[in-house]
Amino acid sequence: MAVFNSFTFDGINSLDSGVYITGQAVFNAPERVVEMVTVPGRNGAIAIDQGRFENIEVTYPAGCFADNQQDFAEKIATLRNELASRYTYKRLTDTYNPDEFRLGLYRSGLEASAVRYNTAGEFDIVFDCKPQRWLVSGETAQTFTRSGSITNPTLFDAKPLLAVTGSGILTLGTQTMTIIARASSSSVLYIDCESQEAWEVVGAGKVSRNDYIQNAGEEFSVLSAGANTVALGSGITRVVITPRWWRI
């Protein structure tokens, strides 16, 4: 029995519409943003790294097969509409890279060149994706009830999601933050080091708590390549770290 490769976008698997992918051109890398500055009287240019990468266009060469012409047209139309109805970045995975995922937007494609009595065709499906290849392993939370360390297996700084119980000084990597005491010592303060937001869950909603943290140097924690210290100061009883490892 033939095994076909596929992609899944926001829970929609391409094989549900009879669409398979070949995988070519799925492995491209994003462009690093670098400003080149020339100085009068100086040979060459100075490269100033902007600390970020551009979005990347991910193209899946794909094909579809059906029992008849009407079925073929319906499958293509169904998948196109399902993909196009997502207006924000959604999770994108494929069977070529099962340990990774991207965040992307459907951009174009699914214009099939039909063959075999209009019951099969080939086409490209194009997504505009954020530059990171997120590792599935980076979604696994690690819990600390005492000081320890966490190891970043990649070469890129990760910006974790923290869930902190207690108050006091917390050191993660080279950054130190002070968690201000709250009414309940058992309440959990969530800190997103990517969006630089802090909040508590109250009832069914989130309440902003950015004023509950003080960052030394105004920097939020990052997990650098290799081992990173996790130091729980007096009063911090538990820290749960979702590391969000990524590569390009």
Q: Positions of the model-derived regions?
A:
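Oligomerization/assembly interface segments of phage tail-like spikes and tubes
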Residues: 45-70, 119-133, 228
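Short, acidic/charged, Gly/Pro-enriched secondary-structure junctions
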Residues: 8, 12-13, 63-108
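Short, solvent-exposed beta-alpha or beta-beta edge segments that form flexible loop/patches at the rim
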Residues: 24-61, 110
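A structural signal for short, hydrophobic beta-strand segments that form beta-sheets
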Residues: 16-26, 106-112, 241
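Solvent-exposed loop and beta-edge segments used for protein-protein assembly and interaction
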Residues: 52-56, 84-86, 117-121, 154-156, ...
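Short beta-strand and beta-hairpin "edge-sheet" elements
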Residues: 89-133, 139
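Intrinsically disordered, low-complexity segments enriched in serine, threonine, and glycine
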Residues: 135-248
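Polar/acidic, low-complexity leader/linker segments enriched in S/T/G and N/D
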Residues: 1-40
